Every structure is written in structure tokens, then in C-alpha cells.
């Protein structure tokens, strides 16, 4: 049964607001930005006149423009490797033919996937009127003709089915007007090159680390959206981050790596070099310790996930099931089989009002929140990338699934968007989390949770059990092609079974609680079913900020979930330590690489 929301009142309010709001863009032109003016004029012409003889007119047109201004600095051992400043402007034009019930979108044919018929590319960076109109005109013409072909192919496929889907293709939403002032880029308030030099100098203390890179990113973006329904947006945003990758080899040749990341909305909120150096020294020492740590052996039993590790695992396992959007129709049977094998279809579709988590657990996603218990959240926004107001979504209430994240692509359970369509670099917006908060009652202090963990180990007759303090992030850690290939091969072996990649893994001995670091572990087959019965939940709720992959949710792996500042989506997840009673770990079974013939040179 479709759960519907009444939108009539919202549409009336929005219509009244539009009369006043459309005056905003004219005032915005005082900043010499003619983007919205060019978009509006070409939109008016397309709505009035775009039609091939004997063919349907478009019922929906959207123009998306993204200005990106990036400062990127890389350093190692106290010296700069690169320092660049890049400006780009990207355009995407989407055209839909048909109607809200059945249109030209969301169809996979032999020619590929059509989210909505679109034309995309780079345009001039000067925010001028004439060249942008020219680009929009050509892109709109191409997208319209493509939409007609797509709708014809889609209708032919639907006619071949015994029963065509009844779910609409596109939801009706009230238009939103939000034209914000442009942000002025600030590159001089702090000397970022000197900070990168100073922070990376700590790597000189670790000559056995073969690859070390420290990256500073400061990104200013301005997003424009104009639709034929009346939505008009100009939203400026800042994202900044520090990311580091470190790699080496164990004595037996096993490839090892580690990473560091810290993110902030504003550049001025990034940590200062001394704090960065201290954190880099910690992850470098962890990597040094891994070089001499013993291999992990195969294991099955209780696992204690510290809060950062629990947050990472939840991000990977939850994301594929949070979306309530309908998968695209496909005339290619192999595609659906492949997506099923990769775990791309979520576990929660069609399960509204059923228990999916323990009864003491709730889960919310709230893009309008900016802090959690005084800690800043990284995934906040006011309007999503389809022009829908951001909304808090109570996904799980007391263990019962109540809601899912929605874009304007309806699904079997919900037809309306709840403002969660997100994208990176004008990719097709997908329903993705923003600030995801795992909540629970009957929680335990860290000491009590650890005692329960050891008690379970003892009752199982085990001499030691496993604690995971940190999970891997391949998007940051893999800096070389060989590193990337090693990680890909490891992930590929467990795509359909839910294998996970822990980084800092410890044996905890029951006799006295002492810890022993081990290396080479991977978690076997950990999926959402493992969280239906959680043995213990800590009260140490921790904010875990990360860059989410724009295609998160396809396979539910670390590589699929996490991204970098350069092309990811700001996100947060709040999670406590979690104790799972039955987790399986496997050891390293790959081929080690040859060690360098000579030792690393001494560093001055």
C-alpha cells in the first residue's frame, strides 16, 4: 500500500510565496551574476516554443549549474608536492516528456541508463549571460530529442510486460525559491601552504613508511537550479578538509596502509598544524605497529566495535537500504541480475512497520540539524539538489521501520520526496543520508560494555576475542595504483556477502584484558541482519564526519560508501560502541609483494 502525503496546502502556500520570491533574483544581479537571468530567459523560451511537429512538449525542464572553486595543496616530509587553484563551471540540462505518472526517465535499455534525459558539460566560468544562454539552448535541444526517443523505447518495453508498474515516475512537489548571496572565496586568512609543510614534517620521523601524502582542500561551490515548475535556487556552500594517506609493507611483504581525515564546513574551523601533526604521528605509529604485528587467524565470536568503527560499519551496511526510491526499469536482464548480486537492492523495501532493529534502537536522518551534543554535524543543508526542502526523517522508531529516504523518484512505499536527493558534481541526485543518528535506550558505559564483552568471551570458553577500533577507508588510504588494486581485489571477493575491511584490530585476552594488535583481517558476511540482535550498546555516542560517495548504496562496501573532498558529499553519522555476539573474521589470503631491495634513505 502506498503511503501518501497531502500536498495541496503546501502548494497553495508555495504559490503565494512565489509572487514575492520572484523579485529576489533581480536584486541578486547587483553582484554581477547573470546566471539566473540567462537560465530564466532560456527556460521561458523553451517552455513556450520547444516542440517537434507531431510530438509531445516537455512537461518538465530543469537547468542545473555548479560553480566549483578549489584550492588543493599536497605535501610530504615538510615539502610541497603541488599547490593548485582550479575554477570550473558545470552544466546539466534535464528534460522529461510524458507526465508525472509515466515519463522518459528511469529506464535502462541496451543504450544505458536514463535517470532523466539530460545533456551535461562544462561552460564558461565568468557568469556571463550570452554564452550561457547559447549553451543552455543547445543542451535543451539535445535533451528534448533524447527524451522523445527514451519515452518511445520505454513504452515499447512496458507494452511487452504482462503487468506494467503502477508507481509514478516523478513526484509533484511545491516549488522553492531561495536565492542566497554569493560567498567570496578566502584563500589568505591562513597560509595553507605553510601549514601543509609544517604538518607533513612529522613524516620524517617514520622513514619506513614508503608513501605519505598530506592533502589540504578548500572548496567553494555555488549551485543553481531552475525548473519549469518555478523552483529557483542559488545556494553557496563551503567544504574544507585535510586528508592523508600512508602506506608501507610488513616484513613478510603484506601491503599495509592507514589514513587520516578531518573536515569542516568553514576553512577557519580546520585544525591547526600542531594538532594535525599530532594526529598524523598517531596514525603513522599505528602503521609502524602493524608492520610487526602478527597475522590474524580465522575467528568467529563476539566483536566489540569502538564508536568510530561502529559508525563506519553502519554507514556501509545501512546506506543501500535507506533509499525508498524505485529501482529503474530495465530491458536488460543481465543488469538486474548483476545489481542483485552486488546487493544494490535494499533490504527494507516493502517492510514498513516491521521490526528491523532491536526494540531499544531508533534511527533518524536530519539534514536541518547542525550539531549533536555540541559537536558540529557535517551533512547539513536547507534544500536538496532537486529543490525540495530538507526534512527530518524518523526512519526507525523503537526497532520498527517507519520511513525511508526519498527523492522525487517514487517507490513502492512512498510517493513524495522528503528532501534527501543529493549529488556531487551534478551527478544524478539519489536519496542519501545527511546527518544519520543512531539512538538507543538501555545503554552501557564503556567500562560496563567492555566487561559484558569479556564475560561473553569467557562463557564461550575463548581465550581471546576481537575488538575493532578503526575501519578502513579505501578512498583515502589507496594512493597508488597497486594499493588500489590490492583493495579492489579484496572487496571484489566479498561484494555479495557483505565483507568489510577493518584496519585496527586487536585480540583482547580474557585472563587480564590486555590487547594485542593483529593485521590482515577482513569481516565476512556482515550485513543488516547482524544488527537485529545487538548484544550491547554503549553510551559513548560519537560524531563521525566523512565524505560520502555520490553513488553510495550500490554495493554497500567501504569503497562504494566513502569518498574524498574532491568529489564526495558531506555527511555525518552518530553512533556508539556496539557489541555483536557472532561475527566471522578471516585472515589474509592474498599474495604478498616483494620488499624493496634497499632500505629507505635516511631523512634529514
Feature locations, PLM:
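Low-complexity, intrinsically disordered short peptide segments enriched in small/polar/basic residues
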Residues: 9-10, 310
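Dual-mode signal for accessory low-complexity, basic/Gly-rich regions
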Residues: 337-604
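Long, low-complexity, intrinsically disordered N-terminal extensions of eukaryotic proteins, enriched
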Residues: 2, 26-27
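N-terminal secretory signal peptides that target proteins for export/translocation
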Residues: 1-9
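Hydrophobic alpha-helical elements and their junctions with loops/disorder across both membrane
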Residues: 21-26, 53, 154, 462, ...
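Active-site bordering "gate/hinge" segments
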Residues: 27-388, 392, 397-400, 413, ...
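Bacterial N-terminal signal peptides
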Residues: 11-23
Amino acid at each position: 500500500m502506498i503511503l501518501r502525503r497531502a500536498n495541496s496546502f503546501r502548494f497553495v502556500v508555495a504559490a503565494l510565496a512565489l509572487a514575492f520570491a520572484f523579485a529576489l533574483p533581480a536584486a541578486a544581479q547587483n553582484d554581477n551574476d547573470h546566471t539566473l537571468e540567462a537560465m530564466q530567459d532560456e527556460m521561458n523560451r523553451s517552455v513556450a516554443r520547444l516542440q517537434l511537429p507531431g510530438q509531445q512538449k516537455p512537461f518538465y525542464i530543469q537547468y542545473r549549474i555548479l560553480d566549483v572553486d578549489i584550492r588543493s595543496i599536497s605535501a610530504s616530509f615538510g615539502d610541497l608536492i603541488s599547490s593548485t587553484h582550479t575554477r570550473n563551471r558545470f552544466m546539466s540540462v534535464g528534460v522529461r516528456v510524458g507526465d508525472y505518472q509515466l515519463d522518459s526517465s528511469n529506464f535502462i535499455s541496451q543504450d544505458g541508463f536514463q535517470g532523466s534525459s539530460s545533456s551535461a558539460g562544462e561552460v564558461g566560468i565568468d557568469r556571463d549571460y550570452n554564452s550561457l544562454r547559447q549553451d543552455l539552448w543547445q543542451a535543451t535541444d539535445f535533451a528534448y530529442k533524447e527524451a522523445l526517443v527514451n519515452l518511445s523505447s520505454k513504452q515499447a518495453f512496458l507494452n511487452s510486460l504482462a503487468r506494467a508498474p503502477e508507481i509514478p515516475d516523478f513526484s509533484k512537489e511545491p516549488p522553492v525559491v531561495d536565492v542566497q548571496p554569493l560567498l567570496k572565496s578566502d584563500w589568505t586568512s591562513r597560509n595553507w601552504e605553510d601549514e601543509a609543510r609544517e604538518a607533513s614534517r612529522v613524516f620524517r620521523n617514520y622513514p619506513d613508511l614508503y608513501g605519505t601524502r598530506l592533502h589540504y582542500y578548500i572548496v567553494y561551490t555555488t549551485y543553481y537550479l531552475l525548473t519549469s515548475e518555478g523552483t529557483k535556487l542559488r545556494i553557496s556552500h563551503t567544504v574544507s578538509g585535510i586528508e592523508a594517506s600512508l602506506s608501507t609493507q610488513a616484513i613478510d611483504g603484506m601491503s599495509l596502509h592507514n589514513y587520516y581525515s578531518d573536515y569542516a564546513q568553514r576553512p577557519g574551523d580546520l585544525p591547526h598544524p600542531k594538532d594535525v601533526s599530532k594526529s598524523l604521528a598517531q596514525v603513522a605509529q599505528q602503521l609502524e605497529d602493524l608492520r610487526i604485528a602478527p597475522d590474524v587467524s580465522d575467528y568467529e565470536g563476539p566483536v566489540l566495535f569502538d564508536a568510530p568503527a561502529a559508525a563506519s560499519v553502519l554507514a556501509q551496511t545501512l546506506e543501500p537500504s535507506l533509499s525508498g526510491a524505485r529501482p529503474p526499469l530495465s530491458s536488460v536482464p543481465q543488469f538486474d541480475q548483476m545489481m542483485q548480486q552486488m546487493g544494490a537492492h535494499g533490504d527494507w523495501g516493502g517492510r514498513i512497520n516491521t521490526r528491523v532493529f532491536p526494540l531499544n534502537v531508533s534511527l533518524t536522518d536530519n539534514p536541518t540539524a547542525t550539531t549533536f551534543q555540541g559537536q558540529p554535524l557535517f551533512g547539513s543543508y536547507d534544500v536538496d539538489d532537486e529543490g525540495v526542502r530538507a526534512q527530518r526523517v524518523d526512519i526507525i522508531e523503537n526497532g520498527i521501520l517507519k520511513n525511508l529516504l526519498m527523492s522525487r523518484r517514487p517507490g513502492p512505499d512512498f510517493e513524495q520526496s522528503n528532501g534527501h536527493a543529493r549529488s556531487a558534481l551534478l551527478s544524478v541526485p539519489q536519496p542519501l543520508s545527511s546527518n544519520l543518528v543512531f539512538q538507543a535506550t538501555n545503554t552501557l558505559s564503556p567500562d560496563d560494555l567492555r566487561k559484558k564483552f569479556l564475560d561473553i568471551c569467557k562463557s564461550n570458553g575463548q581465550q581471546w576475542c576481537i575488538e575493532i577500533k578503526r575501519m578502513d577507508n579505501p578512498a583515502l588510504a589507496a594512493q597508488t595504483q597497486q594499493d588500489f588494486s590490492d583493495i579492489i581485489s579484496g572487496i571484489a571477493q566479498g561484494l555479495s556477502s557483505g565483507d568489510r575491511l577493518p584496519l585496527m584490530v586487536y585480540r583482547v585476552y580474557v585472563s587480564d584484558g590486555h590487547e594485542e594488535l593483529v593485521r590482515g583481517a577482513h569481516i565476512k558476511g556482515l550485513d543488516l541482519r547482524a544488527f537485529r540482535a545487538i548484544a550491547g550498546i554503549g553510551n559513548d555516542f560519537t560524531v563521525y564526519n566523512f565524505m560520502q560517495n555520490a553513488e553510495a548504496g550500490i554495493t554497500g562496501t567501504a569503497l562504494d560508501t566513502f569518498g574524498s573532498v574532491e568529489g564526495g558529499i558531506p555527511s555525518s553519522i552518530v553512533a556508539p560502541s556496539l557489541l555483536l555476539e557472532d561475527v566471522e573474521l578471516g585472515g589474509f589470503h592474498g599474495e604478498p609483494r616483494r620488499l624493496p631491495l634497499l632500505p629507505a634513505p635516511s631523512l634529514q
